[in-house]
C-alpha cells in the first residue's frame, strides 16, 4: 500500500507556524529567548526517541498531547512564548510538524539577521579551522554571513556536499565515483 507524501503539507504548515512565532517574538523583543527555547527543545528531541515518537504520532488525542506538552515544558523549564506556542501546536494537532517549524524558525531568524544557513555534509567531522574557512568561502560567494550545520555521513567517502538555499555543491567522492562509473559504462 503506497504511503501519501505529506512532506509538502508538513512544510507549508511548519513555515506558517514558524513565521507566526517569529513575528510575535520580534514584536515582543523575545527572538533570542525563543531561539534558546527552540534549541533546548530540539536537543530534547534529539536525545529522546520517546519524545520524537510522541511528537510524530497521530495516535494521541489533542487533549493528551496538550497535557504532555505542558508537563514536558514545565519540567524542561520552557516558558513564555515558546511554551504557549507549543500549547497551540498541540491543541491544533500539529506536533508532527514541530521539527520543520524549528528549522523554519531558524531560517527566518537568520534571514532577519542578514545571515544565510548552509547545510554541509562531510565524510568526517570538520575542524574549527575547516568550518571557519568554509564560512569565509561561502560568504565570498553569497555576500552574507553564513551559519553552517554540519552532518557527518561516512557514505559520501570524502569531500563535501554543501546546500545553500536552492543551490547544492556536491564534491563528494561518492558522486565523483558514480559519474566515473557512468562514463565508463558509456565507453565500454
Swiss-Prot record:
<keyword id="KW-0139">CF(1)</keyword>
<dbReference type="GO" id="GO:0045259">
    <property type="term" value="C:proton-transporting ATP synthase complex"/>
</dbReference>
<keyword id="KW-0472">Membrane</keyword>
<dbReference type="Pfam" id="PF00213">
    <property type="entry name" value="OSCP"/>
</dbReference>
<keyword id="KW-0813">Transport</keyword>
<dbReference type="GO" id="GO:0005886">
    <property type="term" value="C:plasma membrane"/>
</dbReference>
<keyword id="KW-0997">Cell inner membrane</keyword>
<comment type="function">
    <text>This protein is part of the stalk that links CF(0) to CF(1). It either transmits conformational changes from CF(0) to CF(1) or is implicated in proton conduction.</text>
</comment>
<comment type="function">
    <text>F(1)F(0) ATP synthase produces ATP from ADP in the presence of a proton or sodium gradient. F-type ATPases consist of two structural domains, F(1) containing the extramembraneous catalytic core and F(0) containing the membrane proton channel, linked together by a central stalk and a peripheral stalk. During catalysis, ATP synthesis in the catalytic domain of F(1) is coupled via a rotary mechanism of the central stalk subunits to proton translocation.</text>
</comment>
<keyword id="KW-0406">Ion transport</keyword>
<comment type="similarity">
    <text>Belongs to the ATPase delta chain family.</text>
</comment>
<keyword id="KW-0375">Hydrogen ion transport</keyword>
<comment type="subunit">
    <text>F-type ATPases have 2 components, F(1) - the catalytic core - and F(0) - the membrane proton channel. F(1) has five subunits: alpha(3), beta(3), gamma(1), delta(1), epsilon(1). F(0) has three main subunits: a(1), b(2) and c(10-14). The alpha and beta chains form an alternating ring which encloses part of the gamma chain. F(1) is attached to F(0) by a central stalk formed by the gamma and epsilon chains, while a peripheral stalk is formed by the delta and b chains.</text>
</comment>
<keyword id="KW-1003">Cell membrane</keyword>
<keyword id="KW-0066">ATP synthesis</keyword>
<dbReference type="InterPro" id="IPR026015">
    <property type="entry name" value="ATP_synth_OSCP/delta_N_sf"/>
</dbReference>
<dbReference type="InterPro" id="IPR020781">
    <property type="entry name" value="ATPase_OSCP/d_CS"/>
</dbReference>
<dbReference type="InterPro" id="IPR000711">
    <property type="entry name" value="ATPase_OSCP/dsu"/>
</dbReference>
<protein>
    <recommendedName>
        <fullName>ATP synthase subunit delta</fullName>
    </recommendedName>
</protein>
<dbReference type="GO" id="GO:0046933">
    <property type="term" value="F:proton-transporting ATP synthase activity, rotational mechanism"/>
</dbReference>
Amino acid at each position: 500500500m503506497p504511503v501519501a507524501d505529506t512532506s509538502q503539507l508538513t512544510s507549508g504548515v511548519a513555515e506558517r507556524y514558524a513565521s507566526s512565532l517569529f513575528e510575535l517574538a520580534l514584536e515582543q523583543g523575545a527572538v533570542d529567548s525563543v531561539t534558546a527555547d527552540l534549541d533546548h527543545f530540539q536537543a530534547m528531541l534529539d536525545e529522546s526517541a520517546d519524545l520524537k515518537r510522541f511528537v510524530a504520532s497521530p495516535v494521541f488525542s489533542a487533549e493528551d498531547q496538550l497535557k504532555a506538552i505542558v508537563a514536558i515544558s514545565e519540567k524542561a523549564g520552557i516558558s513564555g512564548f515558546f511554551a504557549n506556542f507549543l500549547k497551540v501546536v498541540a491543541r491544533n494537532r500539529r506536533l508532527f510538524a514541530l521539527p520543520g517549524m524549528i528549522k523554519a524558525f531558524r531560517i527566518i531568524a537568520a534571514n532577519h539577521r542578514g545571515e544565510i544557513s548552509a547545510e554541509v555534509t562531510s565524510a568526517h567531522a570538520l575542524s574549527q579551522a575547516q568550518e571557519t574557512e568554509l564560512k569565509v568561502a561561502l560568504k565570498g560567494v553569497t555576500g552574507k554571513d553564513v551559519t553552517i550545520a554540519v552532518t557527518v555521513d561516512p557514505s559520501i567517502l570524502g569531500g563535501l556536499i554543501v546546500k545553500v538555499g536552492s543551490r547544492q555543491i556536491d564534491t563528494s567522492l561518492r558522486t565523483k565515483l558514480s559519474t566515473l562509473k557512468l562514463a565508463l559504462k558509456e565507453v565500454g
